[in-house]
UniProtKB/Swiss-Prot annotation:
It comes from Leptospira interrogans serogroup Icterohaemorrhagiae serovar Lai (strain 56601). Homodimer. GO terms for cellular component: cytosol. The gene is trmD. This is tRNA (guanine-N(1)-)-methyltransferase. Its EC number is 2.1.1.228. It is found in: Cytoplasm. GO terms for molecular function: tRNA (guanine(37)-N1)-methyltransferase activity. Specifically methylates guanosine-37 in various tRNAs.
Amino acid sequence: MKFNFITLFPDKIQSYFSEGLQQKAIESGVFSVNIIQLRNFSGNKHNRVDDTIYGGGPGMLLRVEPIHKAILSLGEEKGIVILTSPSGIPFNQSIAMDLKKGGKPLTFISGYYEGVDHRVTEHLVDMEMSLGNYVLSAGDLASICIADAVSRLLPGFLGADESLLDESHNHPDILEYPQFTKPSEYNGWKVPDVLLSGNHASILAWREQNRKKIERGNYESTFKRSADSGC
C-alpha cells in the first residue's frame, strides 16, 4: 500500500516514518511513503501557496491551483484523496479498516492556516476527515494518525496476528481485557491470582469476564475519577 502526503513540512512526515515499527514495515515492503512538498507547485518565484480570502476575513487559505497540480503529479497513484480538516467526518477504526480493505493508495492533503479554497473540497477530494472536535495548528498530525491507523492493519506490520485481533477498537462493543506485567505486586497493587496460576482455561474465562464495555462520550466521569485519585 502507498501513502502520499501533500504537505508544507516534509521533515515532519519523514521523521515519523523513520523509526520504530513504521520504519521496519517500510523496509519490509509492507507499505511505502511518498512525501510531496506543496510549494514545488506554487507557480510563483516566492513559492507562495496561500492567499487572502475573497469577501474578507482573517487569515489565509491554501490555493486550489498548487494542490490540483500536486495531485495531478501523482497520476494513477493518487488513489483516494483525503483532506484533513476540523469540519470533516470523525475518523474511526471502521474507516481505517475500510481503507485498508480497499488497498488503494491514499493521498493526504494537510490543511493549514484558515483551511483550503473550497474548490479543493468540492472538486479534488474524495474524503474530508477530522480526528475529533478540536483544532490542530496544522493538518500533518491528523494525516499521520490516519496513515498510522491504516498501516498497522496491513499484513506483516504486527508481529503477532493475535495482537491485532484482540485490540479494543477492532470489536464494535467491547474493549480489551486488563493486562499486567512484572512485578506481580507493586505498592500494594496486586496482579489477579488467576493470571499467575498457569491455568489457561481459567485465564481465558477471566479475560472474557473482564472485557470492558465501551462507554462512548463518558469523559466527564473519567476526568472526575482522575481528579479524585492520588499518585
